[in-house]
């Protein structure tokens, strides 16, 4: 038999929320501000000794520019990282790992990514969606559990292979698992594409369609990459995060024991609450952690650049536009940190699926704004490559690499726009199941908290937040009605995207306001909330607009090579 990890019917919904979560403010009629006060206090930011050793190795023996230039993390470097325990950060202590909490693990990956986004990404994949993290905790006792535990203790590298040439997340994977004649094993056949860690992994989770006599089922196969028939067809290279091990994989008759395929009684093992929770945390490790690392680097580079530059004898930092750039970058970094702390650093982070779902795009989008401002700021000395600046003896920073890396992080694992729309769909599904009927627009009118710990401007931001929260349930109902069917969702993706972005901005605003009550940094909070308020006004205006331009008609004309349109556009 295949291994069944859950006896009950799985669900495509994320696990019910039990801990205090911002989701209750959006959909449940209870802002619960007093619960949020103090709820996201950070754990110690001091890195464990083992992580400090990894960082020292990266600082003294690794050239991130060479990794980016050559597009490869050299095998000797990976071997050394293995020896230093970099692939056992999340492994339980009884297996020789550090057993880091999700928040501490995030900080470790962020620190590594501040040296090299590619290496940080690689560690995020392994420690986030590798089989030891995403699958082992749910496995019953047996040979598969024993295998993963043994290889984890050895410091294996892992990943997860789902995407295929036909796309990502298809209901039925085209990679198949057929039983052998005696029924003791499965034979796997198919291709997987864009698989991070695939070329260097020891064990891989692989999504398959199991073709048993009882009918097809989706399964998760655990594959030893040393098995005959496993092949890395090509190493893939990207615009950013260059050097990340990523490949086109082929399984050509790979035979694995029958109990190395995991299924559920009904449904898809990819969509169980436990698996989805692991996936959401992994997205933060893989994308949000490097994004925050890049944003912090840009803030440091901006400060150093501004401190040494003068115009007409006046320090650059005395100019209004420069001050606004530095303040905006600082506020973005603090907001990202606040969202991460709320999502992972508070008690019961596993319950906060909403925060983790939106934190990925919150961090990557904020980091993209920081990088863009930094390019403009440092562009005053020339939009020049690091290599060119070194040639002429000018102070240099790897800003070009950061620019490419953040663009990659915004699309890795799913295009950013689509991620916002999908997050909104998950939110609407939750609303349909749990939201109280007839929630009034003034549901929060009598629940405004005392604001003695906030500055007058931030107190106004808090009141604005409550007003947005009051109107959000009605917006959910409206967008839900517009996108009720499959056809409507395809034709009305933009309202979903807008709803997702509104929710994301509200989450960030709440996180920084709650943080301001803890640490007293009112000015940074004000800068972020003011910028977020302008973004929210635009998003609400678009969502409420009675009609829109004919985007569909223009797109059809462009795709059909309409002669008149082509002539107008010079195509």
Residue ranges and their predicted role:
Residues 83-149, 154, 197-200, 333, ...:
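Internal helix-loop-helix
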Residues 250-283, 300-316, 441, 449-450, ...:
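A glycine-rich, basic-preceded beta-loop-alpha segment at the flavin cofactor/substrate interface
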Residues 445-571:
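C-terminal amphipathic alpha-helical interaction region
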Residues 333-364, 368, 375-385, 508-555:
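C-terminal helix-coil-helix/basic helical segment that borders enzyme active sites and/or dimer interfaces
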Residues 228-257:
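Flexible, small-/acidic-enriched active-site or ligand-binding loops
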